[in-house]
């Protein structure tokens, strides 16, 4: 099956493509089924499997929609079941039988109504009350199950035949006409024992397998699949167990296998999509586990009420019949029995697989085969189904992690390609390393630009590439590109001339006639071969068999490459946009000046707002009703709010500087706190960890304070960890009650059912998963009354039924926690989210503990919920909001910082070009001034660590420079604003100033003087003046070192800078009210201090001035003693 589409974003287009592919595939499935049926009716010798698969995919011979619909109906509504059990369908209200399998009378020991008998009570037929066929105790169990919100969650239930007292597993589900009851005989005492403890007990059968899955290291999907097939084989005992993965183009591959040593291996084989028809895939989502006990056993017909308009759906039945083509396939591969389990993961494109499955997709199947008849009891199948849910969770995490790693690789490659474009556009992306072939997986690539062609890897010739471009321009005039896994199917006339080395192509249109291409060869060379490739006879391809399926797959992909994935097309589309942008002309100089000014404005404004957010956060932390503390990298306290002070009895001045571990932590928690600190300082933040702190003063007699803490690494703007902040919740009262409860063990009623506010929400279940405890706090939290909750199943009926969960994964994780507690593995502080009766989301921490009787036997589970106080929730909400504001501003600054780099590079290129031309002295000075201004701007852009400036840790870049160069740059930065205000700008320097060279940080000095000058210009009345005067005095120090003590005066008339602005400059004002100008002046003052200088702002009569005093080492040792 081919996929060709115009280049666009992957979201909606991907969904539409996948839907179209599935519709096309369903038609191919129907054609193949029709061919088999025609062959069977004529004796069966004319059916060639490989050729039929290839023919079914021929788009020139479409099947009528009516025929496809009829095929799908047969797949879901075939009126046959397997013979290992029997089936009845009844009306839910009356229990009147409306359909039954013909073997019911034999299995239940009753007489068909068609046989004359005097005992009509033990006869079965349409209209019979099913309750008359079961024992009285069985009837009550069935009636209770039918009353449940979801009958399937009660499976299995034990029922006895009234006539023979034979025991059956009854598996119930609803379909479109009524209640379907599948009856499977319980053949041994072990089967009965497995049932006696209910569904929860059956899940315990998978406890070891689940524990092993959860203990595996991340990042290895193949290893995960290997383990799951091993564990399924141990649970079920089948000869062969395989993990079968569906690829994006719907074909399948065996990715893991464990088998009997004498069986032929199938690991690595690929299969065409028709091997698992779309209708079967739907059924695998509807009924996630499918067992065939004996494919050679005769099928049993289903008799149904003539008033039912069509054949009854058996999609949800455990005994759905086996179609002839599948029977033949199994027999050809030497298999008699099979067990197939579906594996679902999250679907980001949200194509629903069926009711209740929105957002899930079928990743693949776990397939088991056995050479002799084999029946697996329902409890073991239920355990396997639960194992598949856990496997799906683990697999989903691995798939998402792999996707993240892939996206990061693509982003890194895009960044490198962008850098190459700046140096050598556009040829750099094909002539340097890495190149465009590193962006996505491909065999070759080509760039067609300006009539020239650059080729990489295995690609068409230059003439062929130009011909493809001509075809795209003429045949796809309204698109920006094309992606296809088959140029033949896409309609390129000369596709077959390219051979098997070029089958698939992704093309990105850059301009009207310029393109970037990626090419892929045929998919066959990507296939991992397994077993003998040519050991079979010529006729093997005609028989339905895994090897012939593989041969059919190779035939299907002969002129086709692997499909282009959505993430790859997104990467190509992004590079296409970047390339288009790189061809645009650089904006004119005036626009660049505007951008530079906007950059500086945004830079300072962002600093101001971030500073304001930080100050607000400090105030919030200090006044929060939740205990919050912070430590530096040495583990010493540098933050301690009023709430933690109240709980411990230790005031803020008393605690500052003390060691959290040595001085404040209770001995029982020292190891925990040390580990918590170590991990947080290394960037690994732990949540919901219990610690105990010592108490002092009036609190000392109450014992240690018990806190549930989240550790957050504190970072500076360069992402360096500078400490740890602990946001906590006081759980001392809850813990005392919980400990007391645990000690009592027996008579707990007075505690659990108390209305005391210190009692946390508590609920419990028996060993079968039914609710046996639901305390008042749980009633208040959930909105569900105790009398309504007691007796209901915790999973699916309470949680997942009345109380909705966020998704299917949430229910699976909850079931894992409950089953772990039943196996004596308690869980502490597990994050748990559900919706209460009114639909409000509830986020809690779940702690489980096993319930034991007086003999120590586990009889159920107790669950404790820890809820955050309203004050803490409010504090966290405010914190998240503040963090979002800070993050938005930081991103905006990062964007501006990134976007300004390109025009800066353009300026740099223009200046570098001009430097190599013949220039006058004045022109050389202008070029030099431009270079110093550019250098200053780049340094400001790189300023990410404002905290280092604040604390005096910034590292200066010292070098030799000319003072005259600095002054020229400073004056040039003030010229435009001075001219706009009609100001006279003077620069007063001594005669020998041009020859003065010193050591220091030229860019930082430039930055400071320019900022002082521009502030003076801003606060000078129109038509006034501004003067910058330099007075250097050279001194010779012992040791022959000469220094220049330099006074810089930036003077201006008028009222001068406002007092509040001066207060901001000298940090005498509240940081939250700092203006843009105040923040800039404050940073400049701190930069001066870093250079061991001093700065003042003075008022003398009608003159105001900044006075900057610096001592700078001279570059020459033999300068004159004075230049004044």
Swiss-Prot record:
GAF domain span: 220-399
Region (Disordered): 1-27
Coiled coil, from the record: none
Biased composition (Low complexity): 1-18
Disulfide bonds: none
Domain Histidine kinase, chain residue ranges per copy: 895-1116
Entry binding sites for phytochromobilin: 325
Known function: Regulatory photoreceptor which exists in two forms that are reversibly interconvertible by light: the Pr form that absorbs maximally in the red region of the spectrum and the Pfr form that absorbs maximally in the far-red region. Photoconversion of Pr to Pfr induces an array of morphogenic responses, whereas reconversion of Pfr to Pr cancels the induction of those responses. Pfr controls the expression of a number of nuclear genes including those encoding the small subunit of ribulose-bisphosphate carboxylase, chlorophyll A/B binding protein, protochlorophyllide reductase, rRNA, etc.
Protein name stated in the entry: Phytochrome
Annotated organism of origin: Mougeotia scalaris
Lineage summary: Eukaryota, Viridiplantae, Streptophyta, Zygnematophyceae, Zygnematophycidae
